[in-house]
Amino acid sequence: VVRKREDGYHEVRMIMQTIQMYDVLEMKKKKIPGIFLAVNYPFIPSDERNLVYKAAKLLMDEFQVEEGVSIRLEKFIPVAAGMAGGSSDAAAALVGINRLFRLGLTERDLMERAVNIGADVPYCVMRGTALAEGIGE
């Protein structure tokens, strides 16, 4: 951590690395419009407070997707442990919605949209090893 910014974010300079720990997202198209999110823990929100929901909504709104989607999120990454579990789930949702509805977005396109969900979500779209600076974007 380099410093705390006036907007509440921390300015960072760090190496980020993906690891073999993951949650499971399963997506299916629905004929009824909307986002139907089910999570395996009752204390995790399944509405617009959830980053998976936000990611799905972001793309579905932008591309005016008329169908709905059913998303099942099974959490294995510890919640609020600083391991980017929510961010990686959001990234997976972006990739999944892009594929499911054949939106044709590239990885770069997804990364550009991902920053609207969270600072480290673009990295989670990219995966691998990266130097993160600024607020982590």
Please report, for each region that a protein language model flagged, where it lies by residue:
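Short, small-residue alpha-helix embedded
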Residues: S87-F101
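Alpha/beta catalytic cores of group-transfer enzymes, especially the acyltransferase/condensing modules
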Residues: G104-E137
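ATP-binding N-lobe of GHMP and related small-molecule kinases
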Residues: V1-A81, R99-R108
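Generic structural signal for isolated residues within well-ordered alpha-helices
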Residues: L58, G96, E112-N116
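A broad detector of short, well-ordered amphipathic alpha-helices
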Residues: Y53-K54, A91, E112
